[in-house]
Design a protein with these regions (language model features):
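Loop-centered beta-sheet repeat module
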Residues: 148-210
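Nucleic-acid nuclease catalytic cores
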Residues: 77-103
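Hydrophobic alpha-helical interaction segments
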Residues: 106, 278-353
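Charged, structured surface patches that assemble and position nucleic-acid processing machinery
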Residues: 103-115
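Conserved catalytic cores of phosphodiester-cleaving nucleases, focusing on short active-site segments
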Residues: 38-78, 84-86, 323
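Acidic-basic catalytic patches of nuclease active cores, encompassing PD-(D/E)XK
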Residues: 1-33
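Short gly/ser-rich loop at a beta-strand->alpha-helix junction or flexible surface loop bordering the NTP-binding
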Residues: 216-301
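Short alpha-helical segments that sit at the start of domains
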Residues: 122-147
Length: 353
């Protein structure tokens, strides 16, 4: 089902808010400004007996669209004194989290919401997406396509022509043209005066990728190696693989610890181009789920190793891949992801001087 226009979406807004606030529909008064273009205008202002809400609608919950909506509705809320709310067809986890971090309320046309204001706390989640389309849409973050995204994130201070990007990524020029067109449309890249591509907000691009990244697609072999700690296990495995010159790199919480020293970990996640199970056998590696503290991941594309670095004698994927793989769902993953993202932000600042 196609996402509705702003006018159609706003026609549903009073009933949705009335239900969330447990008020009769007659208690809500809405002023629409659907065609608003001013920096401090929102699509609608909804007044209740106790509060006012500035509402901005975006027909997509993609990271770039959500970021623009948040910026717009925060300005409107600051000017009017109203509670800022972002309205989308369906709230994904990334959109909800970004709104929470920005102190902007959010709700969707599917019945989910997260709104915090003086004397008000609303949390509704788990309602299905009314606008889910059949099939899997093509994505600029698909396995091969994401090479272009990775290259831009690894070089945040540089500008590239489409020919440059085709050459370094190994993608054909037509594919690169389509990808850059989508990225330009979503506001994730811009063109400079020389018509080269630049990334205005690398953190926004990184979050957009993570939102689409599916850790569950990776082929994973789980097993157990006796070790006194996750750190000790990481060093044991690294030493064994380095001696055999295998291409490998740790990721997930182990990589986050190497990059940021944030939190201990029990389970080591490791990318390897070929199964290292035989090499790890002398360490006591036993394949199986119960008690698994070792996950061996088969990369879908060897570009996962781009940006890899050696820290304390252990080869780790770079900050970008670490941030993506912290979607593994293991303990402290989200907290570690914030630390890794902060470190990447610092690296961007250094690169841009």
């Amino acid at each position: 089902m196609k996402a509705p226009s702003a006018r159609a979406a706003l026609s549903e807004l009073p009933a949705i808010l009335a239900e969330l606030l447990d008020l009769p529909l007659s208690a809500l008064k809405m002023e629409e400004t659907v065609e608003a273009t001013g920096a401090s205008r929102a699509n609608a202002l909804v007044r209740t007996p106790d509060q006012s809400f500035a509402v901005e609608y975006k027909s997509s919950s993609k990271t770039a669209a959500v970021a623009k909506g948040i910026e717009q509705v925060r300005r409107a809320g600051a000017e009017t004194g109203a509670v800022p709310l972002l309205l989308v067809p369906f709230l994904g986890g990334a959109a909800r989290r970004r709104c929470r971090e920005s102190e902007v309320g959010c709700l969707d046309l599917s019945g989910n919401a997260e709104i915090t204001a003086p004397g008000l706390r609303i949390m509704v989640e788990g309602r299905p997406n009314r606008f889910k389309r059949p099939g899997r849409p093509s994505s600029v973050f698909a396995t091969k396509s994401s090479r272009l995204i990775r290259w831009l994130l690894l070089h945040p201070a540089e500008a590239f022509t489409q020919a440059d990007l085709a050459e370094v990524t190994g993608l054909d020029k037509g594919h690169v043209s389509r990808l850059t067109g989508r990225l330009l449309e979503d506001g994730l890249v811009n063109r400079n005066e020389e018509h080269e591509l630049v990334v205005p907000d690398p953190l926004l691009l990184l979050d957009a990728w993570r939102e689409q990244y599916d850790f569950g697609k990776l082929h994973v072999v789980k097993g157990h190696i006796p070790a006194r700690s996750g750190e000790a296990l990481m060093h044991q495995v690294s030493e064994a693989l380095s001696e055999k010159a295998r291409q490998y790199a740790v990721t997930g919480l182990a990589a986050a610890w190497l990059h940021t020293r944030f939190a201990g970990f029990r389970t080591v996640l490791l990318y390897a181009t070929t199964s290292p199970a035989n090499i790890l056998a002398p360490l006591g590696f036993r394949e199986g789920e119960p008690g698994a503290n070792m996950w061996i991941l088969t990369p879908e594309d060897e570009w996962v190793f781009k940006g890899a670095t050696i820290i304390d004698g252990v080869r780790s994927v770079g900050l970008v891949q670490t941030y993506l793989d912290l979607k593994s769902g293991l303990e402290h993953s989200e907290e570690a992801a914030e630390q890794v993202k902060n470190q990447y932000a610092q690296a961007v600042d250094r690169a841009r001087g």
